[in-house]
Amino acid sequence: MSVRLPLLLRQLGRQQLPSGPACRLRELCRSGSRSSSSGGGDPEGLRGRRLQDGQTFSSHGPGNPEAPGMDSIVRDVIHNSKEVLSLLQEKNPAFKPVLVVIQAGDDNLMKDMNQNLAKEAGLDITHICLPPDSGEDEIIDEILKINEDPRVHGLTLQISEDSLSNKVLNALKPEKDVDGVTDINLGKLVRGDAPECFVSPLAKAAVELVEKSGITLDGKKVLVVGAHGPLEAALQWLFQRKGSMTMSCPWATPQLPDKLREADIVVLGSPKPEEIPAVWIPSGTTILNCFHDFLSGKLSGGSPGVPVDKLIAEESVSLLAAALRIQNMVSSGRRWLREQQHRRWRLHCLKLQPLSPVPSDIEISRGQTPKAVDVLAKEIGLLADEIEIYGKSKAKVQLSLLERLKDQTDGKYVLVAGITPTPLGEGKSTVTIGLVQALTAHLKVNSFACLRQPSQGPTFGVKGGAAGGGYAQVIPMEEFNLHLTGDIHAITAANNLLAAAIDTRILHESTQTDKALYNRLVPLVNGVREFSEIQLSRLKKLGIHKTDPSTLTEEEVRKFARLNIDPATITWQRVLDTNDRFLRKITIGQGSTEKGYSRQAQFDIAVASEIMAVLALTDSLTDMKERLGRMVVASDKDGQPVTAEDLGVTGALTVLMKDAIKPNLMQTLEGTPVFVHAGPFANIAHGNSSVLADKIALKLVGEEGFVVTEAGFGADIGMEKFFNIKCRASGLVPNVVVLVATVRALKMHGGGPSVTAGVPLKKEYTEENIQLVADGCCNLQKQIQIAQLFGVPVVVALNVFKTDTRAEIDLVCELAKRAGAFDAVPCYHWSAGGKGSVDLARAVREAANKRSRFQFLYDVQLPIVEKIRVIAQTVYGAKDIELSPEAQSKIDRYTQQGFGNLPICMAKTHLSLSHEPDKKGVPRDFTLPISDVRASIGAGFIYPLVGTMSTMPGLPTRPCFYDIDLDTETEQVKGLF
């Protein structure tokens, strides 16, 4: 043990053999005390005065057997605490418990005592010193801040009795209340749940010191005088547990003389008033002094006139209490670590009462009252300061959670993909939600769904919402499908700010001299020119190592001020979250103020913005800022890339996106958690929800839990991009692929009539047709083979419709297993909720235990053309690829610019394995045409355009908005589906 504890004991007046060279100690003395003449060394102070006055300082009376010294008692407590902490830190090296002491007044003795004991045990300690006259609200404000700090594991209050109101005490979080003063801790103590609560260190010290002095408590009469509140309750309970008959009373009680005469042990909870004669306490009574004046910073040293032949002084109680507080701190840390480990959530799942026929999605959603989102957050282990609540049913989650749970083992990772879909969709979102409802609400396994945020374009267009459907959906579905927390609006604002910066820069460069342009870019402010931080970064990129704007040469000024953007190479478009076909090609700059600068441009749908892809692939705020800065918007006239960083807009984009980076927390119909975050399209982008949502969810579910995420469209598009793009960015590898199929889609691939949104299905789809199903299973078999290319086990989920027959269902499951699926399971979640997907959940759990042999499809170091060819031939089944001259030119440019080692994101129709939407089943012997190649350098991929791909959808003849309305009386949304 280090020298700190012996020194502290000597400061408090204990006899202690010298250890090493003598030290000059700060003496905590009473005025008028004289120096001890002993060479070894009891410093003049409290003990010296008592010995001179004939008082006994030890915890035993004259003639009693020698009790253990205080130093050995405290030493044992601290040593045991240190050993336990060391064992905890062996398994958790980053774990360092922190005790915070909120102190009102200048109590240096208590401060020193806490600091020395904490350091001896290996704890960190922080003192917050408030003015002595601090009010209740000020104290509570400090408590609430500490409550929500995940770095703090214990909180103690050392303030005057007058300030310790019930409101103040119960402001403490019970799990951080190492003094055991909250009603919850006291209630558990009284109920007999001492192992589950914190016991008052002061009360526990009092009882232990009596026992250490050789007194048997069984049958003794104990009187607690002048104590109240938590201390009184704890003392009474602890003495009663030892078999003592315990009474409690204030000093002013009329029966006090009789009670004192009857007591074997008297515990003083406050100073004895002068008017109460000392003779009321009979000789031979054991007295414990538990009072300490926090404002004066002085130990009470006993109450005036109290007989001291069996006095256990306050400094003895205080020192042991401080050591026991450290013991409680270690227990708090141990409990906290246990909470961080995998545990089954204490989740209150919402009950479903499925109806038949199944009502509309919005009726089902509205018929279920969601839990308050803060309740859900607490159930899954989020701290109060880790969420930002939006309304009652959605919240954003802070990225700091990843740091707190960095040592937590990830859960199992499940990807939901699908066969080549009909235009109606085959229910991947519904399967995803049904699966997590089954896992958590029915199998009691922690699980999280991670979904993309839907664009408002399809919501008001032809597809409708994307919250799932039937009894497997996210609620409230109208909030899910509309603005949510504004992430897409933030992307729109950031994207269009960058677009404005591009054209504005071209305009200003074309109308100003180098000097005028430079003077405006680096203006005089109070007579001084200074480069901004982002301008210094540009200088560094240009190889100009200067920081004084006045020292640049004319050539350096020109290089710095002029980007020389080639308008013909601009790839950055403006965006809007609305389907508007008339913005597919526009002319900008036709106003007279633009001085004749105009060019042809276009609008894309907002979710096609590269900023959406950046949001989906980033893993931190720092990474997002770097990715935003790397986004290439054009080339200059020398063929070099021009980035957002060159335009000086990176910081502004990051500011606009700082809240959008936080995943959005919602819930399913059965009250299980869902992250809704990022929504890139799968045909024109990579089509997956965010890396951050997946990473946070994997930590929250724990080692035995499951995170289920979805890849857009068919496995040939969304799943391939998930593996080759998202998994490269995240470093995560899924344990299982769930491949969603429907009898309807299989009939289409088997040669059935075309399926068109808004047009009733032909009879082939509503009546049994075994042959069509059998012929169409070729597409299912191909998609299973694609998943197997990556070495991940496949479970087929057959999303059953009411028109499907048992023979059709059995046939699909049989053929899927023959094709190599680990299992194939019919699912009824749409009509029955999680209960209808329990078999799927069991199959997924079993498949997740199978060893995955994951591998990427290609090496990113291959040339761009070869990577495109690998995907076309291996995944789509193409004979070869054909590059247009423009595509070849772009590939050459990106390779020359150093972007040739990025993964590939194919922009292709989702309605066929080929480039032709009407080619169903498994097309063969086709050549895949690459019409253009673009680059999302910030997101980190090259995306070839296959055939003609529109990045701005249009509205149909009868859009969904015909059915959408608002009840102005109730403010309820109608018509969403």
UniProtKB/Swiss-Prot annotation:
Disulfide bonds: none annotated. Residues 32-347 are annotated as: Methylenetetrahydrofolate dehydrogenase and cyclohydrolase. The modification N6-succinyllysine is found at residues 188, 595. Its main location: mitochondrion. The keyword Flavoprotein does not apply. In the N-terminal section; belongs to the tetrahydrofolate dehydrogenase/cyclohydrolase family. In the C-terminal section; belongs to the formate--tetrahydrofolate ligase family. This is Monofunctional C1-tetrahydrofolate synthase, mitochondrial. It comes from Mus musculus (Mouse).
